[in-house]
Design a protein with these regions (language model features):
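Structural motif
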Residues: 33-34, 37-40, 59-60, 75-76
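Conserved catalytic alpha/beta core of Sir2/sirtuin-type deacylases, generalized to analogous enzyme cores
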Residues: 1-3, 103
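Positively charged, polar, low-complexity stretches
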Residues: 8-11, 22-26, 44-69, 92-94
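C-terminal structural segments of small proteins and small subunits
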Residues: 66-103
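N-terminal first-folded block
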Residues: 4-34
């Protein structure tokens, strides 16, 4: 069963509201509402993501994996749709608060 976050990311991909990869996120000019990174992201890329978090004034979350994405080599992505980003933030903060995975 897919998690809610996986579903929301899937909706954002279908809508075309996702930026893939640290370099693309760093060069992106429009507003980004939430940043997501995997645990396997390199330390240098984590620094880039932190700079982007400050630049875009948004939240940055670490997620277990992105195996559900077709782009298997993707370890960082940004959501550019406010409503989907808000839904992801709500679910992720609830998970972090409760210390459990929400399906």
């Amino acid at each position: 069963m897919k998690s809610k976050i996986e579903s929301y990311i899937g909706f954002a991909i279908k809508k075309g509201s996702v930026v893939f990869g640290c370099d693309s996120i760093e060069r992106f000019k429009k507003k980004i509402f939430v940043l997501l990174e995997t645990q396997s992201l390199s330390p240098n890329s984590r620094k880039v993501m932190e700079k982007c978090r400050v630049k875009f004034d948004c939240k940055l979350f670490e997620i277990e994996d992105f195996d559900f994405l077709k782009n298997k080599n993707c370890k960082a992505l940004a959501i550019c749709d406010k409503s989907l980003a808000d839904a992801i933030v709500k679910v992720k903060e609830a998970e972090d608060k409760n210390g459990e995975h929400i399906n």
